[in-house]
Amino acid sequence: MSKLNAYFGEYGGQFVPQILVPALDQLEQEFIKAQADESFKQEFKELLQEYAGRPTALTKTRNIVKNTKTTLYLKREDLLHGGAHKTNQVLGQALLAKRMGKKEIIAETGAGQHGVATALACALLDLKCRVYMGAKDVERQSPNVFRMKLMGAEVIPVHSGSATLKDACNEALRDWSANYSKAHYLLGTAAGPHPFPTIVREFQRMIGEETKQQILAKEGRLPDAVIACVGGGSNAIGMFADFIDEKNVKLIGVEPAGKGIETGEHGAPLKHGKTGIFFGMKAPLMQNSDGQIEESYSISAGLDFPSVGPQHAHLLAIGRAEYASATDDEALDAFKLLCKKEGIIPALESSHALAHALKLAYEDPNKEQLLVVNLSGRGDKDIFTVHDILKEKGEI
């Protein structure tokens, strides 16, 4: 039986109740077979092209870094059906579930984007769908909750703990433990127990593959850096995967610094966490001195996650990727600027990556550099949040 590597350096693994091991083993074997099956790959490719709208554009910005020598491109995952990069890997996993004969899909969601993507894939592929969502996030993201329901998904609010994403993850795993024979757990990020981090990366890697082809066609060279926001880390690993072996391309992940790292209200476990076991994996975690999981915080529900995918932890440990952070205010400024200067409303998640790119462009305006930001999603879901914050600040 061929096996994928369960670890990235010291990170990853499979820390789950024994009852789930057969389900994870089955998933791993089916994934290995599917990756070698031309008809599976063709069906996935067709869905991505005909249904989701790939390849997505690589857009050169016109105004936002006009007074610098930086050339800035945006990889437009916001243009994907469903509004974010989430759709890519969800279609892949849903096809895998069908291949395994599973009729039901269980998912967790924070911002609601993964829930929406899962709901649309289940509607398309005729699978029963239930989505666990922290009760707080249900309030924060009502448009996405309604979208899921419109597409036939059952949305289950989770009131335990902090009533956010980590609690939804726990409930989803609990459900799967009871129902794994008929249900597939469609995990929403490149984290969790093996083989999920690998599967999600492989079903997102077209982001970086397309970017590489597109930038070579437009600029005749590879970028100096690719930049992506990091919550669980799937959009970032999708962008990074095809560039890992290109040693001259910097890989920069941007975590949410929330109200400031020093306040403790942030979601930056890579740079400011401790290694522990959470959500079925060994990874950096936000923990207090007793080793309890700390609440993460970010203006953006999709980055509000107290851990991170194991491959990111490994890339940091070996020095191949670097990880910065952006505060709520910096992300908000980048959000407003992209709206005003380019006519694109980005997701608050993606705005963190953009904020760091702008920092790089403006800290040395005379530096010639070619940067690509993964614009991982569109900001329609965030306009009410932003409206309320700007109103509070007296800006509108």
Swiss-Prot record:
Q: Which reaction does it catalyse?
A: (1S,2R)-1-C-(indol-3-yl)glycerol 3-phosphate + L-serine = D-glyceraldehyde 3-phosphate + L-tryptophan + H2O
Q: Part of which pathway?
A: Amino-acid biosynthesis; L-tryptophan biosynthesis; L-tryptophan from chorismate: step 5/5
Q: Which EC number applies?
A: 4.2.1.20
Q: Which cofactor does it need?
A: pyridoxal 5'-phosphate
Q: Which UniProt keywords apply?
A: Amino-acid biosynthesis, Aromatic amino acid biosynthesis, Lyase, Pyridoxal phosphate, Tryptophan biosynthesis
Q: Name one GO cellular component term.
A: cytoplasm
Q: Which InterPro entries match?
A: Trp_synth_b_CS, Trp_synth_beta, Trp_synth_beta/beta-like, TrpB-like_PALP, TrpB-like_PALP_sf
Spell out the PROSITE patterns in the cross-references.
TRP_SYNTHASE_BETA
Annotated positions of the N6-(pyridoxal phosphate)lysine modification: 86
Q: What class of enzyme is it?
A: lyase
Top-rank taxon of the source lineage equals Bacteria
Which GO molecular-function terms appear in the entry?
tryptophan synthase activity
Provide the family line.
Belongs to the TrpB family.
Query: What PANTHER family does its record include?
Result: TRYPTOPHAN SYNTHASE, TRYPTOPHAN SYNTHASE-RELATED
**Assembly and interaction partners:** Tetramer of two alpha and two beta chains.
HAMAP family recorded for this chain? Trp_synth_beta
Q: What does this protein do?
A: The beta subunit is responsible for the synthesis of L-tryptophan from indole and L-serine.
Q: What name goes with this protein?
A: Tryptophan synthase beta chain
Q: Which organism is it from?
A: Francisella tularensis subsp. novicida (strain U112)
User: Gene symbol?
Assistant: trpB
